[in-house]
Regions:
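Conserved catalytic SET/PR domain of SAM-dependent protein methyltransferases, capturing the structural core
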Residues: 1-180
Length: 180
């Protein structure tokens, strides 16, 4: 079992999906829908959990494969997750920080990362609407999506908190929005 969220693909979707080569050149992998879905249909629902609680869960059961959206409340939380992943001695610190910067997202001023990769790539013509409600984030189809189409989120919707931008700058890492 890998502790690294970017290597986990079991993302608990409500519809059938598959990871394939992205339709975007040089983007790597993407997630594709294997059935036609209608606008407004639930694609995914995941619970939000604080990074400290997530680490405690894994310390109790390193094989826990529950998928979460992991919340970072401040600069120190970002350093905490780096230290946790360093303890596995599988990647160096710079590689871990880079991966974190690639997989970070926000909703309603909450900075989070997924415990399993979604493989959603960026498109300004996204087909996923994200909704934050209580302790969950829901992903709905923002339009009808035909079978075998790739799922996209518009990264421009992310409102990155200042502590994340400062963390990236202090670690000489590009934040995800600077790639757009």
């Amino acid at each position: 079992m890998t502790p690294f969220f970017w290597l986990k693909e079991n993302s608990k979707f409500e519809v059938e999906t598959e990871i394939q080569k992205s339709s975007i050149p040089d983007a790597g992998k993407g997630r594709f829908i294997l059935e036609h879905i209608k606008k407004g249909q639930l694609i995914r629902k995941l619970k939000l959990i604080n990074i400290k609680d997530y680490i405690d869960i894994l310390k109790l059961n390193e094989n826990d494969d529950t998928n979460y959206f992991i919340i970072f409340n401040n600069y120190n939380d970002l350093d905490l997750v780096v230290e946790y992943f360093k303890s596995f001695n599988l990647l160096d610190e710079d590689e871990i920080k880079l991966k974190i910067s690639w997989f970070i997202a926000t909703i309603d001023n909450k900075l989070y990362i997924q415990s399993h990769s979604s493989y959603y790539n960026h498109s300004s013509d996204s087909n996923i609407k994200r909704v934050f409600e209580k302790e969950y984030i829901y992903h709905y189809a923002s339009k009808d999506i035909d079978k075998n189409n790739e799922l996209f989120i518009d990264y421009n919707d992310y409102n990155m908190p200042e502590y994340y931008l400062k963390w990236c700058k202090n670690n000489n890492i590009q934040d995800i929005l600077s790639f757009l």
